[in-house]
């Protein structure tokens, strides 16, 4: 389920940027995994990645001191 509000996403990470980066990284991983399958599109991967972040399957680590973050 995709949340209807960005407030829900801000409960997951400390910024919208962190959520976008995490979702993009996960979508890229998924698209590489399903690269051979023509039934999957990138938009499907982004939706799936967002769903995984919202449901806690992908954890967004807090920022490090140097400003980088782990997904």
UniProtKB/Swiss-Prot annotation:
EC number: 2.7.7.6
Keyword annotations: DNA-directed RNA polymerase, Nucleotidyltransferase, Transcription, Transferase
SUPFAM superfamilies: RPB6/omega subunit-like
Assembly and binders: The RNAP catalytic core consists of 2 alpha, 1 beta, 1 beta' and 1 omega subunit. When a sigma factor is associated with the core the holoenzyme is formed, which can initiate transcription.
SMART domains referenced in this protein's UniProt entry, alphabetically: RNA_pol_Rpb6 (SM01409)
Top-level class of the enzyme under EC nomenclature: transferase
Protein name from the UniProt record: DNA-directed RNA polymerase subunit omega
Domain of life where this protein originates: Bacteria
Function: Promotes RNA polymerase assembly. Latches the N- and C-terminal regions of the beta' subunit thereby facilitating its interaction with the beta and alpha subunits.
MF annotations from Gene Ontology: DNA binding; DNA-directed RNA polymerase activity
One GO process term, biological-process aspect: DNA-templated transcription
Swiss-Prot/TrEMBL catalytic activity: RNA(n) + a ribonucleoside 5'-triphosphate = RNA(n+1) + diphosphate
């Amino acid at each position: 389920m995709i949340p209807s509000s960005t407030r829900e996403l801000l409960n997951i990470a400390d910024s919208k940027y962190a959520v976008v980066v995490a979702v993009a990284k996960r979508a890229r991983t998924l698209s590489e995994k399903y690269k051979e399958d023509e039934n999957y599109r990138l938009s499907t991967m982004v939706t799936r990645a967002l769903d995984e972040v919202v449901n806690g399957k992908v954890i967004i680590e807090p920022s490090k001191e140097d400003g980088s973050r782990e997904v």
